[in-house]
Amino acid sequence: MGSQTPDVREPFVAEVVGNPSVVYRKAFFLEVHTEVWEKALDNPFLMGQIWALYRCQPAYQVTQTDDGIHIVDPTGITGDLRRIERAPLARVFYGRGTFDHWAIPSFFTADGVIVFEWKETPGLIAAEATISMRGNNWISRAVMKLFSGTLMRRIDSRFTNNLESLRIILSDIERNPQKIREGLGREDI
C-alpha cells in the first residue's frame, strides 16, 4: 500500500498532495468482505444515514450534494466531500472544510485528500488511510504546521473512534442487513 497516486490532473489535488500542511497515515484491518467495504466507500451519504441510525458519535449531520456530501460536525468542522477516483483496491476523496470554533478564526479553512488503499483476503481487509491536508491561506498553513502535533493527535483520536463505530456498522451490513433496512425503512439496500 502507499502506492496509490491521486488524480493529479486536478490542480487542487496536486497542490494538497504535493505540498501538504500535515499528513496522517493509519493502517487498519476490517473483518469484512471486499464488496461490503467498497460499497461503504462508494456510498458516503448512505453511510451517513446508517451512522445516524446507530447514533454513533460524533453525531454528524450529512446531506447529499450534487457531487458528494456536506458534513456538519458538532465540534465545529463543516465541509464538503466528494470521491475523485475509484480504482481497484483504492478510493480517493477530496474535501474542503472550515472550522467554526471560538478559538479558531473564521478564515481558517483547509483542503484535504483522503486515500484509502487495501488488500483483499477472504473476509479480511488490510487497509491504509492517508489524509493530506493543506491550509487554504498562509495563516491556515502556518497554524496547521505550528500545531501539527496536536492536530495529528486529534485526527488519530477521531479516526480511531470512527473506525470502531464503522467496524460495528460494517459487521451488521454483512451479517444482519435486514436490521439496517428496517431501521432506515428501505428495502433497496
Task: Explain the meaning of each model-derived region.
Residues 1-5, 113-189:
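Terminal "cap-and-tail" regions of soluble proteins that handle hydrophobic small molecules
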Residues 22, 31, 87, 121-123:
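Solvent-exposed loop and beta-edge segments used for protein-protein assembly and interaction
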Residues 25-33, 39-42, 104, 147, ...:
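Extracytoplasmic/periplasmic, Sec-exported soluble proteins
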Residues 41, 52-54, 73-75, 85, ...:
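A mature extracytoplasmic/lumenal domain signature
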